[in-house]
Amino acid sequence: MDFLNDIKVYDNVLDQSAITEVFEFLSRNFYTLARTNDTDALERSKKFLRLKRTEEELQEFKKEFLQQQMADAIRDKDLKAEKLYWTRIHKGAPECTQEDELLCAALYEGLANVCDLPPYEALGNVYTNMLRTMDRPTAHIDNIDPKNRTVMFYTNAVWHRDWGGETIFYDLDDNIIKAVQPKPGRVVSFDGRIPHSGRPPVTSAYVPRYITVMKF
């Protein structure tokens, strides 16, 4: 399970001026409610990842996973508040604006200064999740395909160690293997097969925790 060790943290990817500008953009924009991650889906993915799989098995699992997501979407209108979270899509959706595209380009440029990246055109989707005190995020796996990668920007202008908001990474037995504090300008890049979850900010933060995510 070498992929569980593939977690890289980069600090000061954005300077304070840039991160403040990004935060101001994110904090004044509109967010929509989306369905939170499904615990059963996580358990199915973990079971699949425990064994070595063929390419055919991988593609079949991805197909079944997508079909389940589509079935779940039909029932989304009946979800209670604790099963929802706030998100904004910046790339890959009709509602994206020119400002969203400028944000994506700026974040990509900053990241390119600290690590090797695929071409910008290979960037799949970009979105920001807003996590508030009392929200109930659940652990999940982004993608079981070994060719994928998740990059997470911490986009609050200010954050204190006592405010919570960490990203927690787990092994396949639910043991915590790493916790990453959401310091402004920090980026964590990881194999999307690693189970992880966000921690909500504690009451003393008085602000939501923002993360902007790129999927490659």
Q: Regions from the language model: what does each represent?
A:
Residues M1-L117:
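Non-heme Fe(II)/2-oxoglutarate
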